[in-house]
């Protein structure tokens, strides 16, 4: 049975090259934890979190994804997708997931899942039964 005041872990992302696991705490406060796994993946230690990554200006975190050197941070309540570059330690892009932006004909009502592909396309899953695709400008 789930607690109605669920504020726990909400998203995971994996950076295979560095064996780093990113874990998102949904809210109060929204926070991202980073864990470094050993080469055999049998032990783990918490990694230092960049200050810039803790300065997230969104209401909640509903999903994470990793692509190239960027961590994608999805917010259900803010209806935004933030892109944080781990090399430059800065937020480099934001997608507004509301009507009129990026060819959306309506708001994504409850974006909760995200995946990025090697061509940098982004898929966002939203309740009820919506799958939106975003293609980067070339």
Question: For each predicted feature, which ranges?
Answer:
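Sequence/structural signature of beta-propeller domains
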Residues: 1-138
